[in-house]
Amino acid sequence: MSHRRMQLALSLVFILCGLFNSIFCEKQQHSQQHANLVLLKKISAFSQKMEAHPKAFAQELFKALIAENPKKNIIFSPAAMTITLATLSLGIKSTMSTNHPEDLELELKLLDAHKCLHHLVHLGRELVKQKQLRHQDILFLNSKMMANQMLLHQIRKLQKMDIQMIDFSDTEKAKKAISHHVAEKTHTKIRDLITDLNPETILCLVNHIFFKGILKRAFQPNLTQKEDFFLNDKTKVQVDMMRKTEQMLYSRSEELFATMVKMPFKGNVSLILMLPDAGHFDNALKKLTAKRAKLQKISNFRLVHLTLPKFKITFDINFKHLLPKINLKHLLPKIDPKHTLTTTASSQHVTLKAPLPNLEALHQVEIELSEHALTTDTAIHTDNLLKVPANTKEVPVVVKFNRPFLLFVEDEITQTDLFVGQVLNPQVE
């Protein structure tokens, strides 16, 4: 099952290439269907070569982002990226003919694979209901193109996607319109969402997600105070440090030079925080993929006195710029930029003959953690849980996040990473 989720995660590289042919009506419908069939076969064939767990793919993305942004706070959602693009892949599938056995077989495989994402989709909706998450997908289509309305209806139905028609020929006006609409829909002040836009752009996909987890056991607001956070050996900043003492999952790895704690959010979601030792942040990152699972396995419940900074992080990802940098470029079919997909009725053979369209895809994530995560009623209900029993003889382990650290928000049922990030400076959003 995890293998199928990995297939969908990897397929996002190819989905953007195939989306144009599936959304816009062309004169040669026969050609369109066969082109889509070939693209989907390549998605399946190339994805099957990768047998790693979805976490491995998330870590590859993480490494690429860190290489590009070594001194920035980072946060992204592998799950949100996968769900959004997988929904669009259904649009490609829906335009294909199922008259041939091989077409039907591929379609069934894709449907079966999408079932693996149903849990994540359901989880996302539950988090929205619990007011822990806001999620918005917006698809901007070139207003000068004739769109397949049946397909657009399917995308709206499956993903509740906001679809807007826009004229990309006036790039400055289009950039402002996109930023304004996204800000209005996501209730955020977004500046320079798109810095570079081609007037021949066919579509622009914006995926925005905001997460503010509700901890089952809140931090105590009266204990929050200003303290030093060490950005490096020479630089420190004053930040609001939260505190609490409670039983939580704790583990320590001398091999990884890191300490880990895990706290539950409301629902089947948990926050995993990893604190590399001073001077060992880069070393922990290198070993993270192989050692994180081991670190979680050796964890046990301990009484922990936790000190953690309040933070709010916003981070943007441009798919087009990122994907070629995550060691997946060699999996892409080699397409001459001067060619496009066509077919002949006699041979049913797909050849390549004109340029592929310009596409844009952006992923924006915001995450916030504070001591005010719980509602008043829940905070009162759990007040007793925050207190350490007076007769306890256990000495609490002190874990102080006063230097750069890593975070993971994980789905407890599938162990899927909902969010992955690094906090280098809690003062900077």
Swiss-Prot record:
InterPro entries: Serpin_CS (IPR023795), Serpin_dom (IPR023796), Serpin_fam (IPR000215), Serpin_sf (IPR036186), Serpin_sf_1 (IPR042178), Serpin_sf_2 (IPR042185). Glycosylated; carries the so-called mannose 6-phosphate lysosomal recognition marker on its carbohydrate chains. GO terms for biological process: female pregnancy. It comes from the Eukaryota. This is Uterine milk protein. Residues 1-25 form the signal peptide. Glycans are attached at N222, N268. The keyword Glycoprotein applies. Keywords: Glycoprotein, Pregnancy, Protease inhibitor, Serine protease inhibitor, Signal. Belongs to the serpin family. UTMP subfamily. The record marks A390, N391 as: Reactive bond. It comes from Ovis aries. One of its GO terms (molecular function) is serine-type endopeptidase inhibitor activity. SUPFAM superfamilies: Serpins (SSF56574). One of its GO terms (cellular component) is extracellular space.
